[in-house]
Amino acid sequence: GGITCIMGESGAGKTTLLRLLMGLEKADSGIITGFDKVSAVFQENRLIEHLNAVENTALVIKDRNAGKCAYEQLLQLLPKEALLKPVREYSGGMKRRVALVRAMAADSEIVLLDEPFTGLDSRNSKKAAEYILSEQRGRTVISVTHDMEMCKMLGAGICLLTSGKAVATIL
């Protein structure tokens, strides 16, 4: 039910760890359990480009008012006038925010974030961090990042990864 940031140099295995937790890759040894209801922000965002932000987000909301719920969530990070445009017209930072809202809006127990602040300026990074905190709702959030300031803002524990191994943990 907490927030942990995974940090390390490029190639340390951070994204591979997230892919293992999502079941997208198979571990060489050992067993990973307890990752059934997972939502994620991938480095590539993985949005449906011809849909708008509301439609992309509503896909993961299990509520008959999914569109309204998605709209309200998105307003926290995006300008109102952008919400109904196809995401293919968005900047990289706007797409990133839609992907973040979609992951946090899903009915998941665990949220995995792969570089969630990439493409965001400092103001929008701060808003995104505040959004993560407001929408955590007791879920486990694991974020891969290079940004120590964001880890501090999230009040996150930190796990330092080197060559695929956790070499330090700061809680």
Region annotations inferred by a language model:
Residues M22:
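Helix-to-loop junction immediately C-terminal to a conserved catalytic motif
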Residues L51-D63:
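Q-loop/switch helix immediately C-terminal to the Walker
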Residues G67-L83:
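Conserved ABC ATPase "signature" region
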Residues P86-Y90:
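Conserved ABC ATPase signature
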Residues V111-E115:
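Catalytic Walker B motif of ABC-type/P-loop ATPase nucleotide-binding domains
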Residues S122-N124:
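Helix N-cap at the start of a conserved alpha-helix in ABC-type nucleotide-binding domains
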Residues R139-V144:
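Conserved H-loop
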